[in-house]
Protein backbone atom coordinates (compact mmCIF):
# COMPACT_ATOMS: atom_id res chain seq x y z
CA UNK A 1 0.00 0.00 0.00
CA UNK A 2 1.23 3.50 -0.80
CA UNK A 3 1.71 5.88 2.09
CA UNK A 4 0.93 9.51 1.55
CA UNK A 5 3.31 12.15 2.81
CA UNK A 6 2.05 14.11 5.80
CA UNK A 7 0.51 17.40 4.76
CA UNK A 8 0.96 20.25 7.25
CA UNK A 9 -2.28 21.52 8.70
CA UNK A 10 -2.84 24.84 10.39
CA UNK A 11 -2.97 24.53 14.22
CA UNK A 12 -5.75 27.12 14.17
CA UNK A 13 -7.72 25.05 11.66
CA UNK A 14 -7.29 21.89 13.74
CA UNK A 15 -8.25 23.65 16.94
CA UNK A 16 -11.33 25.14 15.30
CA UNK A 17 -12.51 21.76 14.02
CA UNK A 18 -12.04 20.23 17.48
CA UNK A 19 -14.08 23.05 18.98
CA UNK A 20 -16.79 22.67 16.33
CA UNK A 21 -17.18 18.93 16.88
CA UNK A 22 -17.07 19.15 20.66
CA UNK A 23 -19.66 21.94 20.63
CA UNK A 24 -22.16 19.36 19.34
CA UNK A 25 -21.11 15.86 20.30
CA UNK A 26 -19.84 16.69 23.77
CA UNK A 27 -23.11 18.26 24.96
CA UNK A 28 -23.84 15.27 27.21
CA UNK A 29 -23.74 11.55 26.58
CA UNK A 30 -26.75 11.21 28.88
CA UNK A 31 -28.69 13.67 26.70
CA UNK A 32 -28.02 11.83 23.43
CA UNK A 33 -28.95 8.53 25.10
CA UNK A 34 -32.45 9.92 25.68
CA UNK A 35 -33.35 9.75 21.98
CA UNK A 36 -30.83 7.40 20.40
CA UNK A 37 -31.28 3.64 20.29
CA UNK A 38 -29.02 1.29 22.32
CA UNK A 39 -26.39 1.20 19.54
CA UNK A 40 -25.81 4.94 20.16
CA UNK A 41 -25.79 5.48 16.41
CA UNK A 42 -26.33 9.11 15.38
CA UNK A 43 -27.04 8.86 11.66
CA UNK A 44 -29.73 7.80 9.20
CA UNK A 45 -30.99 4.27 9.84
CA UNK A 46 -32.01 1.84 7.09
CA UNK A 47 -35.53 0.48 7.49
CA UNK A 48 -35.36 -2.46 5.13
CA UNK A 49 -37.66 -4.26 5.70
CA UNK A 50 -39.92 -1.42 6.93
CA UNK A 51 -41.00 -3.14 10.15
CA UNK A 52 -37.50 -3.00 11.67
CA UNK A 53 -37.08 -1.27 15.02
CA UNK A 54 -34.73 1.73 15.13
CA UNK A 55 -31.99 -0.41 16.67
CA UNK A 56 -32.39 -3.08 14.00
CA UNK A 57 -32.46 -0.41 11.28
CA UNK A 58 -29.24 1.13 12.57
CA UNK A 59 -27.50 -2.23 12.33
CA UNK A 60 -28.98 -2.61 8.83
CA UNK A 61 -27.46 0.74 7.86
CA UNK A 62 -24.06 -0.26 9.21
CA UNK A 63 -24.28 -3.57 7.34
CA UNK A 64 -25.34 -1.76 4.17
CA UNK A 65 -22.08 0.21 4.31
CA UNK A 66 -19.84 -2.67 5.35
CA UNK A 67 -21.24 -5.08 2.76
CA UNK A 68 -20.07 -2.75 -0.01
CA UNK A 69 -16.44 -2.94 1.13
CA UNK A 70 -15.60 -6.60 0.34
CA UNK A 71 -13.98 -7.02 3.75
CA UNK A 72 -11.81 -10.08 4.41
CA UNK A 73 -10.45 -11.42 7.73
CA UNK A 74 -7.26 -9.66 8.76
CA UNK A 75 -7.89 -6.50 6.75
CA UNK A 76 -7.69 -3.10 8.45
CA UNK A 77 -10.77 -0.88 8.32
CA UNK A 78 -10.55 2.85 8.98
CA UNK A 79 -13.72 4.49 10.34
CA UNK A 80 -13.54 8.26 9.83
CA UNK A 81 -15.85 9.97 12.30
CA UNK A 82 -16.43 6.75 14.23
CA UNK A 83 -19.13 8.04 16.58
CA UNK A 84 -19.73 5.85 19.60
CA UNK A 85 -18.11 2.78 18.02
CA UNK A 86 -20.99 0.68 16.67
CA UNK A 87 -19.64 0.39 13.12
CA UNK A 88 -16.20 -0.72 14.29
CA UNK A 89 -17.67 -3.28 16.65
CA UNK A 90 -19.92 -4.65 13.92
CA UNK A 91 -16.99 -4.89 11.49
CA UNK A 92 -14.84 -6.84 13.94
CA UNK A 93 -17.64 -9.22 14.88
CA UNK A 94 -18.91 -9.85 11.33
CA UNK A 95 -15.70 -9.76 9.31
CA UNK A 96 -12.84 -10.45 11.76
CA UNK A 97 -10.94 -7.30 10.78
CA UNK A 98 -8.64 -4.84 12.51
CA UNK A 99 -10.21 -1.42 13.09
CA UNK A 100 -9.01 2.15 13.53
CA UNK A 101 -11.46 4.90 14.44
CA UNK A 102 -10.98 8.64 14.13
CA UNK A 103 -13.00 11.14 16.16
CA UNK A 104 -12.65 14.73 17.34
CA UNK A 105 -15.06 14.19 20.25
CA UNK A 106 -13.58 13.45 23.67
CA UNK A 107 -16.81 11.82 24.84
CA UNK A 108 -17.00 9.58 21.78
CA UNK A 109 -13.31 8.69 22.12
CA UNK A 110 -13.82 7.55 25.71
CA UNK A 111 -16.91 5.48 24.88
CA UNK A 112 -15.26 3.92 21.80
CA UNK A 113 -12.34 2.73 23.91
CA UNK A 114 -14.80 0.96 26.21
CA UNK A 115 -16.74 -0.55 23.29
CA UNK A 116 -13.61 -1.81 21.54
CA UNK A 117 -12.11 -3.21 24.74
CA UNK A 118 -15.25 -5.28 25.32
CA UNK A 119 -14.96 -7.19 22.02
CA UNK A 120 -13.73 -10.78 22.33
CA UNK A 121 -11.12 -10.77 19.57
CA UNK A 122 -7.38 -10.84 18.97
CA UNK A 123 -7.69 -8.25 16.21
CA UNK A 124 -6.17 -4.81 16.65
CA UNK A 125 -8.61 -2.12 17.79
CA UNK A 126 -7.77 1.52 18.31
CA UNK A 127 -9.53 4.87 18.36
CA UNK A 128 -7.61 8.09 17.82
CA UNK A 129 -8.58 11.59 18.91
CA UNK A 130 -7.62 13.23 15.62
CA UNK A 131 -8.93 14.20 12.21
CA UNK A 132 -8.36 12.53 8.85
CA UNK A 133 -5.94 15.32 7.92
CA UNK A 134 -3.41 13.95 10.41
CA UNK A 135 -3.81 10.28 9.49
CA UNK A 136 -1.51 8.69 6.91
CA UNK A 137 -1.22 5.01 7.90
CA UNK A 138 -1.99 2.38 5.23
CA UNK A 139 -5.42 0.73 5.55
CA UNK A 140 -7.39 -1.68 3.36
CA UNK A 141 -10.88 -0.19 3.50
CA UNK A 142 -12.52 3.04 4.69
CA UNK A 143 -16.01 3.81 5.97
CA UNK A 144 -17.32 7.24 6.95
CA UNK A 145 -20.93 7.64 8.07
CA UNK A 146 -22.20 11.21 8.33
CA UNK A 147 -18.92 12.87 9.24
CA UNK A 148 -18.41 14.30 5.74
CA UNK A 149 -20.73 17.21 6.58
CA UNK A 150 -18.01 18.57 8.89
CA UNK A 151 -15.10 18.45 6.43
CA UNK A 152 -15.69 21.68 4.47
CA UNK A 153 -16.02 22.05 0.70
CA UNK A 154 -12.50 23.43 0.39
CA UNK A 155 -11.03 20.22 1.84
CA UNK A 156 -12.80 17.65 -0.37
CA UNK A 157 -9.94 17.25 -2.85
CA UNK A 158 -7.43 16.68 -0.04
CA UNK A 159 -9.78 14.22 1.67
CA UNK A 160 -10.32 12.03 -1.37
CA UNK A 161 -6.65 12.13 -2.40
CA UNK A 162 -5.60 11.03 1.06
CA UNK A 163 -8.14 8.21 1.16
CA UNK A 164 -7.11 7.08 -2.32
CA UNK A 165 -3.41 7.03 -1.42
CA UNK A 166 -3.62 5.13 1.87
CA UNK A 167 -5.58 2.21 0.38
CA UNK A 168 -4.24 -0.63 -1.82
CA UNK A 169 -5.03 -1.05 -5.52
CA UNK A 170 -8.32 -2.83 -4.74
CA UNK A 171 -9.35 -0.33 -2.05
CA UNK A 172 -13.00 0.45 -1.40
CA UNK A 173 -14.66 3.20 0.62
CA UNK A 174 -18.19 4.24 1.50
CA UNK A 175 -19.18 7.75 2.53
CA UNK A 176 -22.70 8.44 3.80
CA UNK A 177 -23.70 12.09 4.14
CA UNK A 178 -26.67 14.38 4.37
CA UNK A 179 -26.77 16.45 1.19
CA UNK A 180 -28.43 19.58 -0.14
CA UNK A 181 -29.32 20.62 -3.65
CA UNK A 182 -28.01 23.39 -5.87
CA UNK A 183 -30.63 26.17 -6.33
CA UNK A 184 -30.80 25.25 -10.04
CA UNK A 185 -31.68 21.65 -9.13
CA UNK A 186 -34.38 22.81 -6.75
CA UNK A 187 -35.83 25.16 -9.37
CA UNK A 188 -35.95 22.30 -11.89
CA UNK A 189 -38.05 20.33 -9.40
CA UNK A 190 -40.34 23.27 -8.68
CA UNK A 191 -38.66 24.10 -5.36
CA UNK A 192 -37.00 27.32 -4.29
CA UNK A 193 -34.86 28.40 -1.37
CA UNK A 194 -37.19 30.45 0.82
CA UNK A 195 -36.19 32.85 3.57
CA UNK A 196 -37.54 30.35 6.09
CA UNK A 197 -35.37 27.58 4.67
CA UNK A 198 -32.27 29.80 4.61
CA UNK A 199 -32.91 30.77 8.23
CA UNK A 200 -33.20 27.12 9.28
CA UNK A 201 -29.95 26.24 7.49
CA UNK A 202 -28.23 29.11 9.30
CA UNK A 203 -29.61 27.78 12.60
CA UNK A 204 -28.19 24.32 11.85
CA UNK A 205 -24.68 25.52 10.95
CA UNK A 206 -24.42 27.97 13.85
CA UNK A 207 -26.27 26.31 16.75
CA UNK A 208 -26.35 22.56 16.02
CA UNK A 209 -23.35 21.72 13.82
CA UNK A 210 -20.98 24.71 14.09
CA UNK A 211 -18.71 24.80 11.06
CA UNK A 212 -20.83 22.23 9.20
CA UNK A 213 -21.61 22.56 5.51
CA UNK A 214 -23.64 20.14 3.44
CA UNK A 215 -22.29 18.86 0.13
CA UNK A 216 -24.40 17.95 -2.87
CA UNK A 217 -24.35 14.38 -4.14
CA UNK A 218 -22.73 15.66 -7.33
CA UNK A 219 -19.87 17.17 -5.32
CA UNK A 220 -19.30 13.86 -3.55
CA UNK A 221 -19.13 12.04 -6.88
CA UNK A 222 -17.04 14.60 -8.78
CA UNK A 223 -14.38 15.06 -6.11
CA UNK A 224 -14.08 11.29 -5.68
CA UNK A 225 -13.66 10.74 -9.41
CA UNK A 226 -11.10 13.55 -9.57
CA UNK A 227 -8.97 11.65 -7.03
CA UNK A 228 -9.07 8.51 -9.21
CA UNK A 229 -12.03 6.57 -7.79
CA UNK A 230 -14.73 4.91 -9.85
CA UNK A 231 -18.09 5.90 -8.35
CA UNK A 232 -21.17 3.70 -8.97
CA UNK A 233 -24.67 5.17 -8.76
CA UNK A 234 -25.19 6.71 -5.27
CA UNK A 235 -28.03 5.45 -3.10
CA UNK A 236 -30.60 7.89 -1.69
CA UNK A 237 -31.68 7.20 1.90
CA UNK A 238 -34.14 10.10 2.16
CA UNK A 239 -37.25 8.07 3.18
CA UNK A 240 -35.18 6.30 5.82
CA UNK A 241 -33.93 9.57 7.31
CA UNK A 242 -37.47 10.93 7.54
CA UNK A 243 -38.42 7.91 9.66
CA UNK A 244 -35.22 8.11 11.73
CA UNK A 245 -35.73 11.80 12.52
CA UNK A 246 -39.39 11.25 13.42
CA UNK A 247 -38.47 8.50 15.89
CA UNK A 248 -35.69 10.62 17.42
CA UNK A 249 -38.00 13.60 17.79
CA UNK A 250 -40.83 11.57 19.30
CA UNK A 251 -38.45 9.85 21.72
CA UNK A 252 -36.77 13.07 22.86
CA UNK A 253 -40.17 14.73 23.30
CA UNK A 254 -41.32 11.83 25.48
CA UNK A 255 -38.19 12.34 27.61
CA UNK A 256 -38.52 16.13 27.88
CA UNK A 257 -38.22 16.35 31.68
CA UNK A 258 -35.14 14.11 31.77
CA UNK A 259 -33.55 16.03 28.88
CA UNK A 260 -33.98 19.35 30.67
CA UNK A 261 -32.60 17.81 33.85
CA UNK A 262 -29.35 16.61 32.23
CA UNK A 263 -28.86 19.74 30.09
CA UNK A 264 -31.29 22.67 30.06
CA UNK A 265 -34.62 23.71 28.58
CA UNK A 266 -32.72 25.79 26.01
CA UNK A 267 -30.76 22.74 24.79
CA UNK A 268 -33.92 20.62 24.69
CA UNK A 269 -35.80 23.24 22.65
CA UNK A 270 -32.85 23.66 20.29
CA UNK A 271 -32.65 19.95 19.53
CA UNK A 272 -36.40 19.59 19.10
CA UNK A 273 -36.29 22.45 16.58
CA UNK A 274 -33.42 20.68 14.82
CA UNK A 275 -35.03 17.22 14.70
CA UNK A 276 -38.51 18.40 13.67
CA UNK A 277 -37.11 20.91 11.20
CA UNK A 278 -34.88 18.35 9.50
CA UNK A 279 -37.76 15.89 9.29
CA UNK A 280 -39.80 18.60 7.53
CA UNK A 281 -37.09 19.52 5.01
CA UNK A 282 -36.30 15.89 4.18
CA UNK A 283 -40.01 15.28 3.67
CA UNK A 284 -40.25 18.39 1.48
CA UNK A 285 -37.33 17.09 -0.65
CA UNK A 286 -35.10 20.03 0.24
CA UNK A 287 -32.56 17.68 1.83
CA UNK A 288 -31.43 14.12 1.11
CA UNK A 289 -28.98 11.55 2.43
CA UNK A 290 -26.60 9.84 -0.01
CA UNK A 291 -24.58 6.67 0.41
CA UNK A 292 -21.71 6.82 -2.08
CA UNK A 293 -19.28 3.97 -2.83
CA UNK A 294 -15.74 4.66 -4.07
CA UNK A 295 -13.70 2.01 -5.88
CA UNK A 296 -10.00 2.11 -6.70
CA UNK A 297 -9.05 0.72 -10.15
CA UNK A 298 -8.28 -2.75 -8.79
CA UNK A 299 -11.71 -2.99 -7.18
CA UNK A 300 -13.57 -1.58 -10.18
CA UNK A 301 -11.95 -3.97 -12.68
Curated annotation (Swiss-Prot):
Disruption phenotype: Cells lacking this gene result in a decreased permeability and fluidity of the cell envelope due to a drastic difference in the mycolates pattern. The parent strain makes three types of mycolates (alpha-mycolate, methoxymycolates and ketomycolates), but the mutant contains most exclusively alpha-mycolates. The mutated strain grows more slowly in the lungs, spleen and liver of mouse and is cleared more rapidly from the liver than the wild-type strain. Disulfide bonds: none annotated. One of its GO terms (biological process) is lipid biosynthetic process. Pfam families: CMAS. Transmembrane segments: none annotated. Inhibited by S-adenosyl-N-decyl-aminoethyl (SADAE). Pathway: Lipid metabolism; mycolic acid biosynthesis. The active site is at 278. Keywords: Lipid biosynthesis, Lipid metabolism, Methyltransferase, S-adenosyl-L-methionine, Transferase. GO terms for cellular component: peptidoglycan-based cell wall; plasma membrane. SUPFAM superfamilies: S-adenosyl-L-methionine-dependent methyltransferases (SSF53335). Coiled coil: none annotated. GO terms for molecular function: cyclopropane-fatty-acyl-phospholipid synthase activity; methyltransferase activity; S-adenosylmethionine-dependent methyltransferase activity. S-adenosyl-L-methionine binds at residues 42-43, 81-83, 103-108, 132-133, 145. Its EC number is 2.1.1.-. Involved in the biosynthesis of hydroxymycolate, a common precursor of oxygenated mycolic acids (methoxy-mycolate and keto-mycolate). Probably transfers a methyl group from the S-adenosylmethionine (SAM) cofactor and, subsequently or simultaneously, a water molecule onto the double bound of ethylene substrates, leading to the formation of the hydroxylated product at the distal position. Involved in the activation of the antitubercular drug thiacetazone (TAC). Belongs to the CFA/CMAS family. Susceptibility of M.tuberculosis to the second-line antitubercular drug thiacetazone (TAC) requires primary activation by the monooxygenase, EthA, but is not sufficient to hit the lethal target. TAC must be secondarily modified (methylation) to its lethal form which causes growth arrest. MmaA4 activates TAC by interacting directly with TAC or with EthA to produce lethal TAC, but the methylation of the drug appears independent of MmaA4. Monomer. This is Hydroxymycolate synthase MmaA4. It comes from Mycobacterium tuberculosis (strain ATCC 25618 / H37Rv).
Amino acid sequence: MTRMAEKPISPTKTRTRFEDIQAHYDVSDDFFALFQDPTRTYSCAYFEPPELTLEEAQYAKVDLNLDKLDLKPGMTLLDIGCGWGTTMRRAVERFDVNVIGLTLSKNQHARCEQVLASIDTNRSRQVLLQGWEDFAEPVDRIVSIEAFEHFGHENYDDFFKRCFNIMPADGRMTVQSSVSYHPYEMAARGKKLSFETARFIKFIVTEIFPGGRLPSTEMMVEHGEKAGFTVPEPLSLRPHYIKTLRIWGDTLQSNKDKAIEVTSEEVYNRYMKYLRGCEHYFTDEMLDCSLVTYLKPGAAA
